[in-house]
Amino acid sequence: MTESHIDFRRAKFLISAPDIAHLDQYLPGDVGVEIAFAGRSNAGKSSALNALTEQKNLARTSKTPGRTQLINVFELDAQRRLVDLPGYGFAQVPLAMKLKWQQSLGEYLQKRACLSGVVVLMDIRHPLKDLDMQMIEWAVASEIPVLALLTKSDKLAQSAKMKTVNEVRKALVEFGDWVQVEPFSALKGTGKPKVLSILNEWCHPQWLADELENQEDAE
């Protein structure tokens, strides 16, 4: 199948769900392609989603870390979705809620067959915290490719930025081709073309081509 270019500006809100069980109820089965966005509560996840889709208010941003507690799903087209997972690791969130989030995130990564890739967003000034590593390990263990996106790269000088990028790449080298590392700035647009290229590739997995071919054969 020739890869078509996906217009991420067409993303529109589809549903919110409190956990993976409810997600299964709302979505039309575990089919098509989903790309998940995960990160600590202060990683700039909502800002990144808004920048990549060129929509100021697609994902709600908040000055209060930990506000996004739901799984929010955005539709690109009939077969493709972006999934904004709850922010994790915020210190002032009650422990019981933290554990519930972590369980929900783990279940989603391990059980969702249509998951084509995971973007793990990290503030470039504070990368690779324990929960970030856990998310990456969960995804790779499930054979899901990961983009480790180092956000807020405009906060560092070029030399410091590239030093951190290289350090993170070295720290994740054990995962081989399963993990890519890129700097990103929602404010400046740094890294946006590269990120969109990776997401576009993830939007065209072989299983989707097989699904569409089977649908055509059935008709």
Curated annotation (Swiss-Prot):
This is Probable GTP-binding protein EngB. GO terms for molecular function: GTP binding; metal ion binding. The lineage of its organism: Bacteria, Pseudomonadati, Pseudomonadota, Gammaproteobacteria, Alteromonadales. GTP binds at residues 39-46, 66-70, 84-87, 151-154, 184-186. PROSITE patterns: G_ENGB. Keywords: Cell cycle, Cell division, GTP-binding, Magnesium, Metal-binding, Nucleotide-binding, Septation. Residues 31-205 form the EngB-type G domain. InterPro entries: G_ENGB_dom, GTP-bd, GTP-bd_ribosome_bio_YsxC, P-loop_NTPase. GO terms for cellular component: cytosol. PANTHER family: ENGB-TYPE G DOMAIN-CONTAINING PROTEIN, MSS1/TRME-RELATED GTP-BINDING PROTEIN. CDD domains: YihA_EngB. Its cofactor is Mg(2+). It comes from the Bacteria. Mg(2+) binds at S46, T68. GO terms for biological process: division septum assembly. Gene3D superfamilies: P-loop containing nucleotide triphosphate hydrolases (3.40.50.300). Necessary for normal cell division and for the maintenance of normal septation. Belongs to the TRAFAC class TrmE-Era-EngA-EngB-Septin-like GTPase superfamily. EngB GTPase family.
